[in-house]
A protein has these predicted regions:
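Extracytoplasmic cell-surface/polysaccharide-interacting catalytic and binding patches
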Residues: 2-148, 152-275
Length: 275
């Protein structure tokens, strides 16, 4: 007879191990499948690395603009225009000398060629010597003094002579009345060519090369042409290219630079066409 007994069934522990093995195989298969799928996906472009921002250029610190030094304004009150002893004294038909009989304390003879021996205040005398030497050195021309300081009494005689010759109205355009003359200050000189060319004390002297040099260069030595052409309504006198007035280099240079020709205009004084 055949053996009909049932076969022995695996134990519970064996079945548990089989289950673990099966699930392990399944897990490995799943993981492998996932890996395979990932491998088939297109590779993602790498994220671009951040470009370092350009270093911000440093804003230059503005250099402060230096405050310009103001140009000094000429001090018109540095000297008196009323004191007869001042180099800036203004004497005209409306402004007589404050002291009628004024006589400068520092009058000296001027060592230059002359027609009438000239006396001037020391500073003016020194300046005349320098100016006469300069025109000769620069051009070969020569100057001589025609007239310089006149006292009150001498001016009386001079003015009377012009009145006798021309009549008072015309004399007043040519010569100052006593007490109103710049010659009394010791700061004025009338110059002429050496040798005389026939225009002494006349407007025609302005056409000479001597007068042209004087007009252009007198300021260098502290002089101005006191009665310029075309300024009779202001100064009260006809054109006198030969009549030089010492005011000092500072004022003469300022007037030359600004182009202001008369003391009346420079110091903003009333015109003085008449007495």
């Amino acid at each position: 007879m055949s053996d009909l007994r049932p076969r022995n069934r695996p134990s519970r522990a064996v079945r548990r191990r089989r289950t673990i093995v099966i699930w392990s195989i399944v897990g490995v298969a799943v993981v492998g499948a996932i890996v395979a799928v990932i491998a088939l996906l297109p590779a993602a472009s790498p994220a671009p690395e951040p470009t370092p921002s350009a270093t911000a250029s440093r804003t230059p610190t503005p250099t402060p603009t230096p405050t310009p030094t103001p140009t000094p304004t000429f001090n018109t009150s540095a000297q008196s225009i009323d004191d007869p002893a001042s180099y800036w004294v203004v004497v005209n038909k409306q402004r007589p000398l404050a002291i009628p009989g004024y006589e400068p304390a520092d009058l000296v003879p001027v060592p230059v060629p002359f027609i009438n021996e000239p006396y001037l205040r020391q500073a003016a005398s020194d300046a005349v010597v320098q100016m006469f030497a300069a025109i000769t050195a620069e051009t070969g021309l020569e100057l001589q003094a025609q007239s310089a300081y006149r006292s009150y009494s001498v001016q009386e005689s001079v003015y009377a002579g012009w009145v006798s010759s021309l009549g008072q109205a015309q004399a007043d355009l040519t010569s100052a009345r006593p007490g109103h003359s710049e010659h009394q200050t010791g700061l004025a000189i009338d110059v002429n060519a050496l040798p005389d060319q026939g225009c002494a004390l006349e407007p025609c002297w302005g056409a000479t090369p001597h007068a042209a040099w004087v007009a252009a260069n007198a300021y260098r030595f502290g002089f101005i042409v006191r009665y310029p052409d075309g300024k009779t309504p202001i100064t009260g006198y006809e054109y006198e290219p030969y009549h030089l007035r010492y005011v000092g280099v500072e004022l003469a240079t300022e007037m030359h630079t600004t182009g202001i020709q008369t003391l009346e205009e420079f110091f903003v004084l009333p015109a003085a066409p008449t007495y």
